[in-house]
């Protein structure tokens, strides 16, 4: 069984077997008897590596043995291995030639946080969002068959990701085309937060049967032995009355279901995978793992150790005076929703499996009957809110910008067309840093402002966030407030829940010649630049409805209008300004500053903003360049 470590090593560990096995070809030269020692070395290397850089942590620890077994049994990269989401892919990266570069993990020009096709031939499909792996592996399996290839396609998906409808769409389709593929359910009872819903309960009931394997003839040919009784007992729920054969759900869909087996038992994993490798058609293997396995603190607190920051040096200087920390924007939202829930009993909070990330823990504890975690099901979350709004509730959907993309049709068809009172609290808007382009909130202003009837707001600091959340909540019809990851400028936050006038911006600095129209948290940078250029700075607040009167007035009194946003320039807030000027037949020089028409690669947020010219230096340079052109 795996060794359990109690501390993250600060010095690179001695790993003689891993030194020989940093590619799958090297791994396959090892004897099976050496693999359990290799697993301990790989786990220790992962602890050391992530301790140096920070990053996703618990999920990778839980799939050490599975990762070794997959690369040992299958002919990767010819056999296609697809990791769902990618939080668990660090051991895979270490074993596929990237060990020496793991010190650059999540850093500018370094190893990406998630599998990337451009990074390695072993990363057969780029991921980051949940529940895509089965569809991707199915597509690969079909294409391979059309090309006359016998290669295997393998999807590794967690029980959390299996709560999303897309996964079941693929599970339903694969048997129809008799796809030669394997789906591995990594069942650790976790996604990021604990799983919820009927499917999670169903999987737990599967674990409650200790004798099911002997009841299935097919399993006898595949499983070398059952997992330890103590492991099953630990995960047991009361046996579901009348459930004779676990896995019925998957078998009824047309899959050959095997399991569950112990995902930390390497001999069993290898023997089972070898047998399943030669089976034709859609195969489904259910493995039971523990998130954070092998690191004692993570086993106790898998949510807290989902990801970690890098270790501070032992000799780092200790500041005598504590720095006053600004509140996180998500924290401001978390306080606001509790305050508004106290004031209005109609408020309900909805999140797709991001209770901790969206800062809804306090709300869920204080108002449990009004809190709804729908699991990884963004489409359902939006339409659930629509249904609640139809009956007089006031739903607040707390969701990351990048994940709202997955519920866009529901936002349009089910909420906006019916003009329902739903507030979208859109977290992680703009560039998010080390997680890279799959998690950036680059497009929400563009895809929201084209929807008729919606109010779209961009707060510039913590106090503005609270005000605009109240404004959106009290508005009749759909509304959206987008705010970034991290902390604000430590603005004084007013305790009231008063709204502001919809569609009205605020002049924050009066200057001349140049006017900077700010949509969001770049207000601080704009004010720095304005002091140098004696420019006017306007906090626009609203992308939709746009303060057209203020834009018209400003255009008449300034030589150059500059729009500033942390959103794609194409179709964003700046485009809204230019569209208005065109409709009003106002000829004016306009400079749009925002995210360029590329995917901005992972780095620290400040580095990403500088790369896009959205720091104070870049903003000033762009304005001076335009002023030079217009004379």
UniProtKB/Swiss-Prot annotation:
Keyword presence, Transferase:
yes
UniProt GO MF annotations: 1-deoxy-D-xylulose-5-phosphate synthase activity; magnesium ion binding; thiamine pyrophosphate binding
Task: Please give the superkingdom of this protein's source.
Answer: Bacteria
Q: Which GO terms describe its cellular component?
A: cytosol
Cite the InterPro entries for this sequence.
Answer: Dxylulose-5-P_synthase, THDP-binding, Transketo_C/PFOR_II, Transketolase-like_Pyr-bd, Transketolase_BS, Transketolase_C
UniProt entry tagged with the keyword Metal-binding: yes
- Where thiamine diphosphate binds, per the record, is at 87, 128-130, 160-161, 188, 295, 378
Function comment: Catalyzes the acyloin condensation reaction between C atoms 2 and 3 of pyruvate and glyceraldehyde 3-phosphate to yield 1-deoxy-D-xylulose-5-phosphate (DXP).
Family under the similarity heading: Belongs to the transketolase family. DXPS subfamily.
Subunit-structure text: Homodimer.
Protein name from the UniProt record: 1-deoxy-D-xylulose-5-phosphate synthase
* Species of the source: Pseudomonas syringae pv. tomato (strain ATCC BAA-871 / DC3000)
Its ancestry begins with: Bacteria, Pseudomonadati, Pseudomonadota, Gammaproteobacteria, Pseudomonadales
């Amino acid at each position: 069984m795996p060794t359990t470590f109690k501390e993250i090593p600060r010095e690179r560990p001695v790993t003689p077997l891993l030194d020989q096995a940093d590619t799958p070809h090297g791994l396959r030269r090892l004897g099976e008897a050496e693999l359990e020692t290799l697993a301990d070395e790989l786990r220790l290397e992962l602890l050391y590596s992530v301790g140096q850089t920070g990053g996703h942590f618990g999920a990778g620890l839980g799939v050490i043995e599975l990762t070794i077994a997959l690369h040992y049994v299958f002919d990767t990269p010819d056999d296609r291995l697809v990791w769902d989401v990618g939080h668990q892919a660090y051991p895979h990266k270490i074993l596929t030639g990237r060990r020496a570069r793991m010190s650059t993990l999540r850093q500018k020009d370094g190893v990406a946080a998630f599998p990337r096709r451009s990074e390695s031939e072993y990363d057969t499909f780029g991921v980051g969002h949940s529940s895509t792996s089965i569809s991707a592996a199915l597509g690969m399996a079909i294409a391979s068959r059309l090309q006359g290839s016998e290669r295997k396609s393998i999807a590794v998906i967690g029980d959390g990701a299996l709560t999303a409808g897309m996964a079941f769409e693929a599970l339903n389709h694969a048997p129809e085309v008799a796809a030669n593929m394997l789906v591995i359910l990594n069942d650790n009872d976790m996604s990021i937060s604990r799983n919820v819903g009927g499917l999670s309960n169903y999987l737990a009931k599967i674990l409650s049967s200790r004798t099911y394997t002997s009841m299935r003839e097919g399993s006898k040919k595949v499983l070398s032995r059952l997992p330890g009784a103590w492991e099953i007992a630990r995960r047991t729920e009361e046996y579901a009355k009348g459930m004779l054969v676990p896995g019925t759900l998957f078998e009824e869909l047309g899959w050959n279901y095997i399991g569950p087996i112990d995902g930390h038992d390497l001999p069993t994993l290898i023997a089972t995978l070898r047998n399943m490798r030669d089976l034709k058609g859609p195969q489904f293997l259910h493995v039971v793992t523990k998130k954070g396995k092998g690191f004692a603190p993570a086993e106790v607190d898998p949510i807290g150790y989902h990801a970690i920051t890098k270790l501070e040096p032992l000799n780092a200087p200790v500041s005598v005076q504590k720095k006053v920390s600004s509140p996180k924007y998500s924290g401001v939202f978390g306080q606001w929703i509790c305050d508004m829930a106290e004031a209005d009993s109609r408020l309900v909070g909805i999140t797709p499996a991001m209770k901790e990330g969206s800062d809804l823990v306090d709300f869920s504890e204080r108002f449990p009957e009004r809190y709804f975690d729908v699991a990884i099901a963004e489409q359902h979350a939006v339409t659930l809110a629509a249904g609640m709004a139809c009956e007089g509730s006031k739903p607040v959907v707390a969701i990351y910008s990048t994940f709202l993309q997955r519920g866009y049709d529901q936002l349009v068809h089910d909420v906006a067309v019916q003009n329902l009172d739903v507030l979208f609290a859109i977290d992680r808007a703009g560039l998010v840093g080390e997680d890279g382009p799959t998690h950036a909130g680059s497009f929400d202003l563009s895809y929201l402002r084209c929807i008729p009837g919606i109010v779209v707001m961009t707060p510039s600091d913590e106090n503005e966030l609270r005000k605009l959340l109240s404004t959106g909540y009290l508005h009749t019809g759909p509304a959206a407030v987008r705010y970034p990851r991290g902390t604000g400028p430590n603005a004084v936050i007013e305790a009231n829940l008063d709204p502001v006038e919809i569609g009205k911006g605020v002049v924050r600095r009066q200057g001349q010649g140049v006017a900077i129209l700010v949509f969001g948290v770049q207000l601080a940078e704009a004010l720095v630049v304005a002091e140098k250029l004696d420019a006017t700075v306007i906090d626009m607040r609203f992308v939709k409805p746009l303060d057209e009167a203020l834009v018209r007035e400003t255009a008449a009194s300034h030589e150059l209008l500059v729009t500033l946003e942390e959103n794609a320039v194409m179709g964003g807030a700046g485009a809204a300004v230019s569209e208005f000027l065109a409709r009003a037949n106002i000829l004016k020089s306009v400079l749009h500053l925002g995210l360029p028409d590329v995917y901005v690669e992972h780095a620290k947020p400040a580095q990403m903003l500088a790369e896009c010219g959205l720091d104070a230096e870049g903003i000033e340079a762009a304005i001076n360049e335009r002023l030079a052109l217009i004379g």
